[in-house]
UniProtKB/Swiss-Prot annotation:
HAMAP family: RTC. CDD domains: RNA_Cyclase_Class_II (cd00874). The keyword Nucleus applies. It catalyses: a 3'-end 3'-phospho-ribonucleotide-RNA + ATP = a 3'-end 2',3'-cyclophospho-ribonucleotide-RNA + AMP + diphosphate. GO terms for cellular component: nucleoplasm. Its main location: nucleus. This is RNA 3'-terminal phosphate cyclase. Its EC number is 6.5.1.4. ATP binds at Q104, P131, Y294, D297, Q298, H320. GO terms for biological process: RNA processing. Belongs to the RNA 3'-terminal cyclase family. Type 1 subfamily. It is found in: Nucleus, Nucleoplasm. It comes from Macaca fascicularis (Crab-eating macaque). InterPro entries: RNA3'-term_phos_cycl_insert (IPR013791), RNA3'_phos_cyclase_dom (IPR023797), RNA3'_phos_cyclase_dom_sf (IPR037136), RNA3'_term_phos_cyc (IPR000228), RNA3'_term_phos_cyc_type_1 (IPR017770), RNA3'_term_phos_cycl-like_CS (IPR020719), RNA3'P_cycl/enolpyr_Trfase_a/b (IPR013792), RPTC_insert (IPR036553).
Length: 366
């Protein structure tokens, strides 16, 4: 099964955990042995952190692969994949490391397994420097399912920084191939909704204040739509630790979804958290694209694997997206073209089309 070994420099471009996620997922899918060097070389704490390690171990277990050099602080790993299998797989960051990032690395792999999979992912569900689980369920899920598969995400417990302790269970069945997607028509915004949550000891007033501040901020720019942000107190038995945050979604007439989100920190007042999320959403609505800045890079691996040409329209192409494209081209040999959008209404905006000729990956087990 093994092809020639792929050599990856983990310090280039985004230079972080994303390079590991993209390269190990593609290595696993394509049966290519992989060596990643200089892992997170430029970061303040270089090398593997607990959440990266749990992701690597999970991919190893998904395919009965061999993994060397995988320990906290290690800056070099080698990975030799075998056949991807379904069944129940568990990954636990044992920290507030993001369960959503564990999903990012494992999901493309289990789509090409021999049988249905159930992923038990433990860590932070609403953590910094990663999508919140609400984003994954409300934005990522409906869009990524356009590639022609379905998954179920059951949030058992929410976990926050610094303790983690959250758990989600993801269930999905394998596919024969992925369909290409074409997301180039934004349409107009028809709905804005969201949730502002508090968990643990934080008073419910914090959730109400975040929601109210966000609504006021959005109203300044969008006056003709009802903005429905629900304040929520997470049930005690479904949340571990204390936390607060907000996610706001805008939905368009063509089914595009955009989000703005923010998490509370000690000493930051609730209004500021709400306004930060609202401003992020508004910025994502200004650029004319069909996906927000956080969805861009999460679609690249699926576009690379799909059978045909995919197109998405984006705002400014993020470094994460450029990095994902670089490794999808290097490892999977997919072909990407990124060009400025030519549409009349996009002329004044920083809007791009990312086009990919996918490799038409076929599940050998089906």
């Amino acid at each position: 099964m093994a092809g020639p070994r792929v050599e990856v420099d983990g310090s280039i471009m985004e230079g972080g955990g994303q390079i590991l996620r993209v390269s190990t997922a593609l290595s696993c899918l394509l049966g290519l042995p992989l060596r990643v060097q200089k892992i997170r070389a430029g970061r303040s704490t270089p090398g593997l952190r607990p959440q990266h390690l749990s992701g690597l171990e999970m991919i190893r277990d998904l395919c009965d692969g061999r993994l060397e050099g995988a320990e906290i602080g290690s800056t070099e790993i080698t990975f030799t994949p075998e056949k991807i299998k379904g069944g129940i797989h568990t990954a636990d960051t044992k920290t507030a490391g993001s369960v959503c990032l564990l999903m990012q690395v494992s999901m493309p792999c289990v789509l090409f397994a021999a049988s249905p999979s159930e992923l038990h992912l433990k860590g932070g569900t609403n953590a910094e420097m990663a999508p919140q689980i609400d984003y994954t369920v409300m934005v990522f899920k409906p869009i990524v399912e356009k590639f022609g598969f379905r998954f179920n995400c059951d949030i058992k417990t929410r976990g926050y920084y610094p303790k983690g302790g959250g758990e989600v269970i993801v269930r999905m069945s394998p596919v024969k191939q992925l369909n290409p997607i074409n997301l180039t028509d934004r349409g107009c915004v028809t709905k804005i909704y969201g949730r502002a949550f508090v968990a643990g000891v934080l008073p419910f007033k914090v959730a109400k204040d975040m929601a109210a501040a966000a609504v006021r901020c959005i109203r300044k720019e969008i006056r003709d739509l009802y903005v429905n942000i629900q304040p929520v107190q997470e049930p005690k038995d479904q949340a571990f630790g204390n936390g607060n945050g907000i996610i706001i979604i805008a939905e368009t007439s063509t089914g595009c979804l955009f989000a703005g989100s923010s998490l509370g920190k000690r000493g930051v007042n609730a209004d500021k958290v709400g306004i930060e999320a609202a401003e992020m959403l508004l910025a994502n609505l200004r650029h004319g694209g069909t996906v927000d800045e956080y969805l861009q890079d999460q679609l690249i691996v699926f576009m690379a694997l799909a059978n045909g040409v995919s197109r998405i329209k984006t705002g400014p192409v993020t470094l994460h997206t450029q990095t994902a494209i670089h490794f999808a081209e290097q490892i999977a040999k997919a072909k990407f073209i990124v060009k400025k959008s030519e549409d009349e209404e996009d002329a004044s905006k920083d809007t791009y089309i990312i086009e990919c000729q996918g490799i038409g990956m076929t599940n050998p087990n089906l």
